[in-house]
Amino acid sequence: MCGIVGVVGNTNATDILIQGLEKLEYRGYDSAGIFVLDGADNHLVKAVGRIAELSAKTAGVEGTTGIGHTRWATHGKPTEDNAHPHRSETERFVLVHNGVIENYLEIKEEYLAGHHFKGQTDTEIAVHLIGKFAEEDGLSVLEAFKKALHIIRGSYAFALIDSENPDVIYVAKNKSPLLIGLGEGYNMVCSDAMAMIRETNQYMEIHDQELVIVKADSVEVQDYDGNSRERASYTAELDLSDIGKGTYPYYMLKEIDEQPTVMRKLIQAYTDDAGQVVIDPAIIKAVQDADRIYILAAGTSYHAGFASKKMLEELTDTPVELGISSEWGYGMPLLSKKPLFIFISQSGETADSRQVLVKANEMGIPSLTVTNVPGSTLSREANYTMLLHAGPEIAVASTKAYTAQIAALAFLAKAVGEANGNAKAQAFDLVHELSIVAQSIESTLSEKETIEAKVRELLETTRNAFYIGRGQDYYVAMEASLKLKEISYIQCEGFAAGELKHGTIALIEEGTPVLALLSDPVLANHTRGNIQEVAARGAKVLTIAEENVAKDTDDIVLTTVHPYLSPISMVVPTQLVAYFATLHRGLDVDKPRNLAKSVTVE
């Protein structure tokens, strides 16, 4: 949520800021702004809406130093007054901020009596506080910033400019992502390496409660007490071509189409030349040592955990429990004696999951992060990491990351099972079976026109819909319903088909769309009984079935794949259902309202 970009020492500062903010659009925002300095001249430009609207207002704005921000409203409505950057009382200091300041009202009452505020944000309180300490109390800029940081409670990533000294950006963070980008003769600040991919692939991490003084030719890292911290840079393996849409109208469609390639990349990443599964032995041992696996995640990643639960349990001989990170952060249940926490997060920055990880580290619980972003916070702070190798996922609605998460966990389960001598794991030819999955997805993708026609007939005008399934198909139904509701705004719920008669069937009326998923030969006929129940009450039914359970009347038929991997192939047509339903409603597929790609506040 939200994004920060900053640059010092580059004559193309405005262009760098705008292009950086464009690359952060996927994170979600409702307004944006930049502040640019060129010597004594400075320019503050804000806009509500898209970056294109901000860019149109920056003609003639030039400078060598600046900060930019995309805002997702948490305090105050999306207006230009509330958009960042914000200025201090005298307008000398300018600040952008991601996160939530928990004690901003206390700060306002205790320190800022008589100050005049233009908006209703917690960020404006912070920059006024810094300004007060520097201009009213006579502290140096650095000491004023430090004093403010000691007072402020909450999550934050700050980038501060002193208009009287345009050669430096002051940066600090706590529980919110922020990086330093290292350029040739200039340096940068960004929430995400993707924002600066055009400028550099060299980055420096900032840890919690660290302050960084960024100049064109130097970067100095300190703790809040002024003690220097040594920090090496690292290279981010990102490709500029990966983050473009190419010939696609939307990122989501591109990312759906990339899924067969992602499956094959995972095979390459987690097998050796002989085709044997290769996982870090330390990760295998961590799973072997655990008496219970706890998967912590949110949203789509949570659903991927459910879809992987049976496979993990059967192949590793270890019980698996699922937890919603936002719930566990405030109330961790009674744990087993030797737990292992697995965090699933596309971005590796999910604030709710990090809150749990911090507690796990304090308790000495071993942890594994499964993420798409190397060097992300969850990756750095967990004991172990498995990467998804899916490439940047830009669309807010996750597609390829979900399928990659299940596939990555399959490699983990296979490796641990083989190490344990588990017969099912030894018989599970994952490389072969995942190759079949890739082919199945390609076959589904070739039927886009057929799927689009069925979606137009079923969903174009409806306000409600249901997905149903049993077993693994129920977990896919959960993800399918989330995908449909989050981008098409159709109120959709995913249910275990057997639960219909326990209440949900009361919502079925003439014309209600019900989408049924069938892949398990043992359960398919039971689900077909539920289909008959809803059809008898007037529901319009669309069935998605694997060949081994398909009937001539089914609408979408998929290649049969291994049961452990069926959630990967079964979810793809539901992704297309969501895409086409949204497209034919004239909505923005990639940027649904009120949602952010990376949820970095609790």
Curated annotation (Swiss-Prot):
Q: Which organism is it from?
A: Streptococcus pneumoniae (strain ATCC BAA-255 / R6)
Biased segments, Basic and acidic residues type: 77-87
Question: Where are the active-site residues found?
Answer: C2 (nucleophile), K597 (for fru-6p isomerization activity)
- Name a single GO cellular component: cytosol
Glutamine amidotransferase type-2 domain spans which residues?
Answer: 2-217
SIS domain span: 283-422, 455-592
Q: How does it assemble?
A: Homodimer.
Reactions the enzyme catalyzes: D-fructose 6-phosphate + L-glutamine = D-glucosamine 6-phosphate + L-glutamate
Pfam families linked to this entry: GATase_6, SIS
PROSITE patterns for the chain: GATASE_TYPE_2 (PS51278), SIS (PS51464)
Give the enzyme's EC designation: 2.6.1.16
Q: Which UniProt keywords apply?
A: Aminotransferase, Cytoplasm, Glutamine amidotransferase, Repeat, Transferase
Function, as annotated, reads: Catalyzes the first step in hexosamine metabolism, converting fructose-6P into glucosamine-6P using glutamine as a nitrogen source.
Tell me the enzyme class: transferase
Compartments where located:
Cytoplasm
- Which InterPro entries does UniProt cross-reference here? GATase_2_dom (IPR017932), GFAT (IPR005855), GFAT_N (IPR047084), GlmS/AgaS_SIS (IPR035466), GlmS/FrlB_SIS (IPR035490), Ntn_hydrolases_N (IPR029055), SIS_dom (IPR001347), SIS_dom_sf (IPR046348)
Repeat in keyword set = yes
Please name the HAMAP family in this protein's record.
Answer: GlmS
Q: What is this protein called?
A: Glutamine--fructose-6-phosphate aminotransferase [isomerizing]
Task: Kindly list the GO molecular function terms attached to this UniProt entry.
Answer: carbohydrate derivative binding; glutamine-fructose-6-phosphate transaminase (isomerizing) activity
Note down the stretches annotated as region Disordered: 67-87
